[in-house]
């Protein structure tokens, strides 16, 4: 039987495609030289998938995955309502962490069909 500590300390395996896409996006952005800050910041307004630091700029990242284009591709899933929630959540995160005077931008990592680097699109300063 496995010790409880090893069970509690193991890295959480992704439960679904959303988690897998976020993990792949995080790994990709780390390889690009961005410093990881936080994952899945939740507040009453909404959620931010990933937060990174690119030099002195906080980068708020929305991650999207579409297995097929029946309901549009990943880029088309970024509606104005979602973007507004991300912007407002980011403003709250900056305020909560005393970073209001820091520069920030909003990026999107998109996966269409598969969650891998060949199907990844990085949109910088997308909104």
From Swiss-Prot:
GO molecular function terms listed in the Swiss-Prot or TrEMBL record: nucleic acid binding
InterPro entries: Restrct_endonuc-II-like, tRNA_endonuc-like_dom_sf, UPF0102_YraN-like
Family as reported in the entry's similarity comment: Belongs to the UPF0102 family.
PANTHER family: UPF0102 PROTEIN YRAN (PTHR34039:SF1)
Protein name stated in the entry: UPF0102 protein Mmwyl1_2395
UniProt source species: Marinomonas sp. (strain MWYL1)
């Amino acid at each position: 039987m496995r010790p409880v500590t090893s069970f509690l300390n193991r890295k959480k395996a992704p439960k679904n495609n959303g988690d897998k896409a976020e993990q792949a996006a995080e790994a990709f952005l780390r390889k690009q030289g961005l410093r990881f800050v936080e994952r899945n910041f939740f507040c009453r307004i909404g959620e931010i998938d990933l937060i990174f630091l690119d030099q002195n700029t906080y980068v708020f990242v929305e991650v999207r995955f579409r297995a097929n284009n029946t309901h549009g591709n990943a880029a088309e899933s970024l509606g104005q309502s979602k973007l507004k929630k991300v912007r407002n959540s980011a403003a709250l995160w900056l305020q909560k962490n005393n970073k209001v005077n820091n520069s920030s931008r909003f990026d999107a990592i998109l996966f269409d069909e598969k969650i891998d680097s060949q199907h990844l699109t990085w949109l910088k300063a997308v909104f």
